[in-house]
Amino acid sequence: EEGWKTPEVAFCWLSLGSEGRKEQLLRTDQDNAVLYETPAPEQAKHTENYFLALGEKVTQTLIACGFKKCPADIMANNTKWCQPLSGWKEYFQHWILSPEPQALMHATILFDFRPVYGETRLADELKRFILEKVVAGRGFIQFLAKNALQNPPPLSFFRNFIVEHGGKHIGQAQNSHNFFLTGY
């Protein structure tokens, strides 16, 4: 709270991607977001600033604990990923109705959200909204399946992990780019 007037809206801290799926490995980066109730228009800017400051404080604390900053900046201290429920609904509706490559990339990270703190009812409401839109926009599942087939999990014929043979990730599997599960 540190000098901030606490907004009169509920919020929920979300873990995303491998964090959301509980598949986090020891050496991983952060993927997180903030979801908060849509405030009254006159409170919108203060509420946004409050939750961005909270996102900054938490992400910096996680960095101090050894969790690297997300290279794609998908973290709660980024305005794009610190949104009211109405903002998140707009994002997901756009991604579902316009499944272009960038939308599918966001889908593979953000559809695996898991509430880890706060009002989980907000995450439940968002999940219901997403499911309604996916059912109504039937073509999205086909695009998602095609994307999954183009980015298979890193498994060999014998079901062993395929690891990187060069670069800075030699001997490591890149699970955050090749796995996609749902639910929390």
Please tell me what each predicted stretch does:
Residues 1-184:
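A nucleotide- and high-energy phosphate-metabolite-utilizing enzyme signature
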